[in-house]
Amino acid sequence: LAQGRPISGHVAFLGGPLHFLPELRKRFIETLKLDDEHVVKVDYGNYFVAMGAALSDEAEVIDVARLEQSIAKAKEAAARETRKADFTLFEDRADYEAFKARHDKDKVRRGDLSAYRGPVYIGIDAGSTTTKITAIGKDKEILYTSYGSNQGSPLKTVVKEMKGLYAALPEGTHIAGAMTTGYGEAIVKAALHADGGEVETFAHLRAAQEFCPDVTFVLDIGGQDMKCFFVKDGSIGNITLNEACSAGCGSFIQNFAEGLHMTPAEFAAKAIDSKAPVDLGTRCTVFMNSKVKQAQKEGADVADISAGIAFSVIKNALFKVMQLKDVRELGDHIVVQGGTFYNDAVLRCMEKLLDRDVIRPDIAGLMGAYGAAILAMEAAEEAGMQQSSLLSPDELDHFSVATSSYRCRGCGNKCLITMQKFPDGGKYFTGNRCERGIGGQKKDSDTPNIYQYKYERLFKY
């Protein structure tokens, strides 16, 4: 905010956050190195701007009637801004049932794991907020699935879920291939000795092709990310991601639901009965909170607000993230996936805005893991591999991670590198900007560094 200019003299801390959060004021004072003499103590910092407006020489004297008229005009303007959307999700219950019946056809083949015999292929999708595991058989049928929250530790979650999978495997089965994908693809592959790792966009595309071989466009909306990719001749031609922030994704809907003391599923179900969805626009979701409150003041019920939020999520994806100009750019075969599309209202808004039907697989939230499992099977068959290198149940029982940090001295950046060491001696590094700090480009030197030796001899334990 200072833009390089020094902050000096007597400083007053104004506004709600600095008024109600004393620790925030304290951190500012420490950072600016202010003493008590130069800190202006303000009793009503949260009202300071309003007080200044009241004391201004430019303030006008108006009567109560004129004030009431101005307030009424402001309310009318707010009401026009929070206008109703120009469509309803479903005309009646029969329309919704027909919608459900159409999408219930997009189902993956499933098999009975307890009765299955033969090779099993594993796909692990370590996402930003959830971990998904899918096991498939030799005919690409799903035998086992797992879907759960990372709880801040994706690696521990994967180990836990893999133990559950091993416990469910009957005699006569063996894991012939395993592949990882998602945010945690690299570390999970290194830790569990998976046979391979794949970028999540390719995993999602491979899964989408099982439902629609001629797919032309895939939209994946997860908990905190959004991926849109165009497909041409079976390959990805262009990719768009929500790089700036995670607003407008699944966690956005979940937060609103929790604010109303409802589960996301209950909140989504309310939207089905909406007859006049509230148009909340596509602005930042922080500002959208105020528009929701305004809609509530005007009498909008939960159903209309839920439908309006679903409408905003899709508008954000199509017109803000993708900056779509012409619907024809998407082609005729559209597949949507990600846990957010379990919400029927979001799916219906997608179809309404595009004015065409789309395909939502019944495993929309597992598509990354399913695609990784298929890729694992294809890689194993191509290599003639019969047994995966994945850690065994006994090795998982004794699995642990030792974490340490050190400064790289390969160049002036002096990167702070975090090393995670596994029981078998394997290592995984993060924080490095190049390969020097992890042993990739060591320089031979005949001269020993006695100070470095002394430091490591004393403290590297």
Predicted regions and their residues:
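Glycine-rich phosphate-binding loops at beta-strand->alpha-helix junctions
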Residues: 1-31, 42-46, 182-184, 312, ...
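Phosphate/ATP-binding catalytic cores across multiple sugar-kinase/actin-like superfamilies
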Residues: 1-7, 101-110, 308-331
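Conserved phosphate-binding/catalytic loops in two-lobed NTP-binding clefts
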Residues: 14, 29-51, 195-201, 351-370
